[in-house]
């Protein structure tokens, strides 16, 4: 089972690919960020992100894509940009035939740390520990994407144990 986790954004989109390593363990396959320059026209930024995502899915052939649900904070402009990036993620997944699983930030924290109100540092340390990484993944967007991917992997495992119920 291989899951592509995404932390959406238009300037920097974090991605993390994890897979089941057997015996209840997980392994990081690849992680990083797709970045677009701030002076690039918005439609070209979204196109660049789409192409980067399509390339990741073609190379790694994930069984599912996991993405955080949109969190609407105080900054409406940021929420709009994140919403646009999420749209690109959903389109790229649909074009690649990859099913999408969405998680709230609390669900991601619960899946990774066992505590839905864990702080960012606690989540990052658990991502490092669960994946056996020598250091906390950087930048933060990549660590967040790995956490989302782990939530997706844990959810897929549970669904498989329950006989495919979703």
Swiss-Prot record:
EC number(s) on file: 3.1.21.10
Residues holding Mg(2+) 1: 7, 141
Binding annotation for Mg(2+) 2: 68
Domain of life from the UniProt record: Bacteria
UniProt xrefs under Gene3D superfamilies: Ribonuclease H-like superfamily/Ribonuclease H
Main location: cytoplasm
Protein localization: Cytoplasm
Keywords carried by this UniProt record: Cytoplasm, DNA damage, DNA recombination, DNA repair, DNA-binding, Endonuclease, Hydrolase, Magnesium, Metal-binding, Nuclease
Subunit structure of this chain's protein: Homodimer which binds Holliday junction (HJ) DNA. The HJ becomes 2-fold symmetrical on binding to RuvC with unstacked arms; it has a different conformation from HJ DNA in complex with RuvA. In the full resolvosome a probable DNA-RuvA(4)-RuvB(12)-RuvC(2) complex forms which resolves the HJ.
Protein name according to UniProt: Crossover junction endodeoxyribonuclease RuvC
Organism: Symbiobacterium thermophilum (strain DSM 24528 / JCM 14929 / IAM 14863 / T)
Lineage, top ranks: Bacteria, Bacillati, Bacillota, Clostridia, Eubacteriales
Name of the gene this protein is made from: ruvC
């Amino acid at each position: 089972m291989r899951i592509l986790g995404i932390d959406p954004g238009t300037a920097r989109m974090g991605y993390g690919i994890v897979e089941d390593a057997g015996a209840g363990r997980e392994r990081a396959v690849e992680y990083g960020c797709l970045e677009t320059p701030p002076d690039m026209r918005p439609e070209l930024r979204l196109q660049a992100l789409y192409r980067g995502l399509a390339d990741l899915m073609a190379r790694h052939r994930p069984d599912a894509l996991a993405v955080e649900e949109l969190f609407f904070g105080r900054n409406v402009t940021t929420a709009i940009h994140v919403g646009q990036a999420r749209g690109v993620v959903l389109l790229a997944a649909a074009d690649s035939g990859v099913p999408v699983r969405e998680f709230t930030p609390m669900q991601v924290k619960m899946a990774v740390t066992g505590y839905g109100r864990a702080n960012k540092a606690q989540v990052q340390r658990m991502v490092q520990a669960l994946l056996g990484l020598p250091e906390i993944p950087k930048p933060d967007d990549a660590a967040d994407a790995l956490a989302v991917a782990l939530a997706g992997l844990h959810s897929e495992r549970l669904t498989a144990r329950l006989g495919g119920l979703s």
